[in-house]
From Swiss-Prot:
Keywords: Aminoacyl-tRNA synthetase, ATP-binding, Cytoplasm, Ligase, Nucleotide-binding, Protein biosynthesis
Main localisation: cytoplasm
Entry's Gene Ontology cellular component terms: cytosol
Assembly and oligomerization: Homodimer.
EC number: 6.1.1.15
Gene: proS
Entry similarity comment: Belongs to the class-II aminoacyl-tRNA synthetase family. ProS type 2 subfamily.
Protein name: Proline--tRNA ligase
């Protein structure tokens, strides 16, 4: 993409309304525009990152054997009355009447609707296990929306639901989701720690929240520092292997890690003092096992092996897709701007032309741009007639992991400069070598999607 033709309304000054880093940088980089309290338009740069995150979510859900679908944003209030949850959400739930005076609501979650779909079409235990998910916009009428996309009223969320014949099968689904989420977050360049949590209005016998450590986090967290040394890495997982999924869950949850809601001071004190940590965290996902909480009142049953009807065991699993952008920025930035991890960056590399209008630099940039594209690399080419300092400032603000700088002095020796946004280190090499090096850097990102 040529920057001269791109819509990226960058701001020079910090917006006064932004209280935290991610909100400030997303506004300054032209990623979002506020339309109402807690409601945002996603401008091209922000939308591009949002879609990269969503794509990783879809890939990892497919890898775990989960099936994508799409449910509407508006739901019938009758389903929520049937489950007994219609009043639980209070004023957070946006209630609507259509022209026929029927009660509708803008869904904050989808347990009722997915249970209704299941009971309408699944009748036998032979159709189990089943896990369905979708990625859809949600609305919760927060009393005090703030912090940009971190605590908005409208947000994009992946929510999935498993249906199993027995508690044992449902707990395997729980473990499978925990493993899948660990891999999902790591691909995004995040370390999201699974922590024992409270079920809230969704309920559940077992639940873990995934939190990213950040000073601006809304939750106080208590954990054993050894957990931050754990990495999912490139391990291969057979999601049908009960023992393997259970082993990964135990590896990542056996050490103490809890939110303030479930914190046990006595247990925490048993950890060696040098390993005790108290910090703040941003919730980016949560998984639940809630047994027959919804299936029993809503009649979601199947014919079991003995011919009798039994309620299915269920769980739900959510990832805050739009919130993840804020969490990534909170975890990865400096005083000049965003530092995107390679897995979610809107563009793989930026090209800066130091002498726009010069035949040699223009030609070299065009050739470099074409070759990067041929190698499957998405480049943002700053071809504007601007000062070099302004171009560097824009690239630093936007936070692409790599920058190629092209100038007449370097080209005289067939050299360009490849710079890491994270470390600031620069290396001179030929344009061809820069393309090869970038392809090597991004190959693990491409491989992870396979």
């Amino acid at each position: 993409m040529r920057l001269s033709r791109y819509f990226m309304p960058v701001l020079k000054e910090d917006p006064k309304e932004a209280q935290i880093v991610s909100h400030r940088l997303m506004l300054r980089a032209g990623m979002i525009k506020q339309q109402a309290a807690g409601i945002y338009s996603w401008l091209p740069l922000g939308y591009k990152v949002l879609r990269r995150i969503e794509q990783i979510v879809h890939e990892e859900q497919a890898r775990a054997g989960h099936i994508a679908m799409l449910m509407p944003t508006l739901q019938s209030a009758d389903l929520w009355r049937e489950s007994g949850r219609y009043d639980d959400y209070g004023e957070e739930m946006l209630r609507i009447k259509d022209r026929h005076k029927r009660d509708l609501l803008y869904g904050p979650t989808n347990e009722e609707m997915i249970t209704d779909i299941f009971r309408s079409h699944v009748n036998s235990y032979k159709d189990l296990p089943l896990t369905l998910y979708h990625v859809q916009w949600k609305f919760r009428d927060e009393i005090r929306p703030r912090f940009g996309v971190m605590r908005g009223r409208e947000f994009l969320m992946k929510d999935g639901y498993n249906f199993d014949l027995t508690k044992e099968d449902a707990l395997h689904a729980y473990n499978r989701h925990l493993v899948s989420y660990l891999r999902t977050y790591e691909r995004m360049g995040l370390q999201a720690i699974p922590m024992r949590a409270d079920g809230g209005p969704i309920g559940g016998d077992y639940t873990h929240e995934f939190l990213v450590l950040a000073e601006t986090g809304e939750s106080e967290v208590f954990y054993d520092s050894e957990i931050t040394d754990l990495k999912f890495g490139d391990r291969r997982i057979d999601y049908d292997d009960v023992a393997q999924c259970r082993a990964v869950l135990e590896e990542f949850t056996s050490r103490y890690a809890r939110t303030d809601e479930t914190h046990d001071a006595a247990l925490f004190e048993q950890i060696p003092k040098e390993r005790r940590r108290v910090a703040r965290g941003i919730e980016v996902g949560q998984i639940f096992y809630f047994g027959t909480k919804y299936s029993e009142p809503m009649g979601a049953t199947v014919v079991g092996p003995d011919g009798s009807r039994v309620p299915v065991h269920m769980g739900s699993h959510g990832i805050g897709v739009s919130r993840l952008l804020g969490a990534i920025i909170e975890a990865s930035h400096d005083d000049r701007g965003i530092i995107w991890p390679e897995g979610v960056t809107p563009f793989h590399v930026g090209i800066v032309n130091l002498k726009q209008g010069d035949a040699s630099t223009d030609g070299a940039c065009e050739a470099l741009y074409a070759e990067l594209k041929a190698q499957g690399l998405d480049a943002l080419y700053d071809d504007r007639d601007e000062r070099a300092g302004a171009k560097f400032a824009t690239m630093d603000l936007v936070g692409l992991p790599w920058r190629i700088t092209v100038g007449p002095r370097g080209l005289a020796a067939n050299k360009v400069e490849l710079t890491s946004r994270r470390t600031g280190e620069s290396v001179e090499m030929s344009p061809q070598e820069a393309v090869v090096r970038l392809r090597e850097i991004y190959q693990p990102v491409f491989d992870a999607a396979k």
